[in-house]
């Protein structure tokens, strides 16, 4: 039986640099292939070649789809063939309805007039196919990210998709939303729709894939049956070396208490009747990594936003640093108290995409380079930028390159470099490795470990329970704004954390000092 897709000996160059070097990929109808590799490995370039974003003639090699050679000059050419790609940054128009998004550019008309009745009927069938129980008239901006992802799939199905490409589809989804999405993909597989799945979450890759294709430095390293590969096998192929331990296995010597929060309560910015954080108290020691776990809506991010002075609503409670009560109502006051934060959404809150890498690093510490006068000491700033880039191993062709052009992992390292310029005593990391590859994760985990060895106290909020458990000395478990458990991490399991989150009564254990 012929393959649905064959990409033969694809090479794509930018100037003298080969982004893709003689890569081949093939899959059958109804097959799920995961494409794995570090950021910058060439995955996105290969998919842009396949989809016609890089047109025929701009690359070497051959693409055969459904028995015919594709020579696409535009993404619409491949869409007509039945190839659809859903990017991590969803391409929906938030102000339009679900129906309007699904039929955007593919409206059903009769005599030049749109047939809304027929489109509504078709839309309802598409939504049912992706298990979405919503009205076609719902505004997309009112949907959660998981629902928006399913609308994107419904939009692809409306184009008679035969090959669906999903690029980091679960990066911003909850575990429940992820489970729903994977079930939808399996259902599509039963209907003969093939899928190329791109994700840094190797547990998902293992769960969903028939085969796994690994690319490193623009070259095809290997394609194997998923059933015969472990996560360690995938990592070794991706990074070219064996990572014996993803999380640093070094004991932390904790010091005195540096932070204590008492009876923190925060209200919804608009609806004062809703408590997003409800009477939460906890402490933090020097040289300790404190993980905060919980489902989406648990109040984790809201808690640390209050601590950093950026929660947009009202809140009350007491914050003590070194035993002294402090008042923190904005980020400047937090920084003055020795607190720095890497935000949850780095693209929205962490970087200025069009600004240079170096300027992003020094953005919060420009007073270091003024010497009490208004004029900036450019030489001192450049020296500091180069040292930070070297220390954090930020991969960039130049400090003057716009940071938006870097991979997610290198953007995150630049934000960490900015935080370290503030000489923090308390470092808050909200989703520190979201959307970055395994190699960059490993480097960030090593850096976190080095910081706590220096006595810096670290708070880690993560939706990935293995990350929380792999890093933390102690884990706070939150649910619906309340602190449900305070657990010493002596071989804690994911099941124990989830049980603590979902049990009805409080279960706050005493800390061992």
From Swiss-Prot:
Q: Where is the signal peptide?
A: none
Q: Which residues form the ABC transporter domain?
A: 5-242, 259-505
Recorded GO molecular functions are: ABC-type D-xylose transporter activity; ATP binding; ATP hydrolysis activity
Q: Which reaction does it catalyse?
A: D-xylose(out) + ATP + H2O = D-xylose(in) + ADP + phosphate + H(+)
Query: Which EC main class describes this enzyme?
Result: translocase
Please indicate if the UniProt record lists Cell membrane as a keyword: yes
Function per UniProt: Part of the ABC transporter complex XylFGH involved in xylose import. Responsible for energy coupling to the transport system.
Q: How does it assemble?
A: The complex is composed of two ATP-binding proteins (XylG), two transmembrane proteins (XylH) and a solute-binding protein (XylF).
This one is known as Xylose import ATP-binding protein XylG
């Amino acid at each position: 039986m012929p393959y649905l897709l064959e990409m033969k000996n694809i090479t794509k160059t930018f100037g003298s640099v080969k982004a893709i070097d003689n890569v081949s990929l093939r899959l059958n109808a109804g097959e799920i292939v995961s494409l794995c590799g570090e950021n910058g490995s060439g995955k996105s370039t290969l998919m842009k070649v396949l989809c016609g974003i890089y047109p025929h003639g701009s690359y070497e090699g051959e693409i055969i789809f459904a028995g015919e050679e594709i020579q696409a000059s535009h993404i619409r050419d491949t869409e007509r063939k039945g190839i659809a790609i859903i990017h991590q940054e969803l391409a929906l128009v938030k102000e339009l309805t679900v129906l309007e998004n699904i039929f955007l550019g593919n409206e059903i008309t009769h005599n030049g007039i749109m047939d809304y009745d027929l489109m509504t009927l078709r839309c309802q069938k598409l939504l049912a196919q992706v298990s979405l129980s919503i009205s076609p008239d719902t505004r997309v901006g009112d949907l959660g990210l998981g629902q928006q992802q399913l609308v994107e799939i419904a939009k692809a199905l409306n184009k008679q998709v035969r090959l669906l490409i999903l690029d980091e589809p679960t990066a911003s989804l909850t575990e429940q939303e992820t489970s729903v999405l994977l079930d939808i993909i399996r259902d599509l597989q039963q209907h003969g729709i093939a899928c190329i799945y791109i994700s840094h979450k190797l547990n998902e890759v293992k769960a969903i894939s028939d085969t796994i294709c690994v690319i490193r430095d623009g070259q095809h390293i290997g394609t194997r049956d998923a059933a015969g590969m472990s996560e360690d096998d995938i990592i070794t192929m991706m990074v070219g070396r064996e990572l014996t331990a993803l999380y640093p296995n070094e004991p932390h010597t904790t010091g005195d208490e540096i932070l204590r929060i008492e009876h923190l309560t925060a209200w919804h910015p608009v609806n004062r009747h809703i408590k997003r954080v409800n009477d939460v108290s906890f402490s933090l020691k020097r040289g300790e990594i404190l993980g905060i776990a919980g489902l989406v809506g648990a109040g984790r991010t809201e808690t640390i936003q209050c601590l950093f002075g950026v929660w947009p609503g009202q809140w009350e409670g007491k914050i003590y640093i070194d035993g002294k009560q402090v008042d923190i109502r904005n980020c400047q006051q937090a920084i003055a108290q020795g607190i720095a934060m890497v935000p949850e959404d780095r693209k929205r809150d962490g970087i200025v995409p069009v600004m240079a890498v170096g300027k992003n690093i020094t953005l919060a510490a420009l007073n270091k380079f003024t010497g009490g006068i208004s004029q900036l000491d450019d030489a001192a700033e450049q020296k500091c930028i180069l040292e930070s880039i070297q220390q954090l191993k930020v991969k960039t062709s130049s400090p003057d390159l716009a940071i938006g052009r870097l991979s997610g992992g290198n953007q995150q390292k630049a934000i960490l470099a900015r935080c370290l310029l503030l000489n923090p005593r308390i470092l808050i990391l909200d989703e520190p490795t979201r959307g970055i590859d395994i190699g960059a994760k490993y480097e960030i985990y090593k850096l976190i470990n080095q910081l706590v060895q220096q006595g810096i106290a670290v708070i880690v909020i993560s939706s990935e329970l293995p990350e929380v458990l792999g890093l933390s000395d102690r884990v706070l478990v939150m649910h619906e704004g309340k602190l449900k458990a305070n657990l010493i991490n002596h071989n804690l399991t994911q099941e124990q954390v989830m049980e603590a989150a979902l049990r009805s009564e409080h279960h706050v254990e005493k800390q061992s000092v």
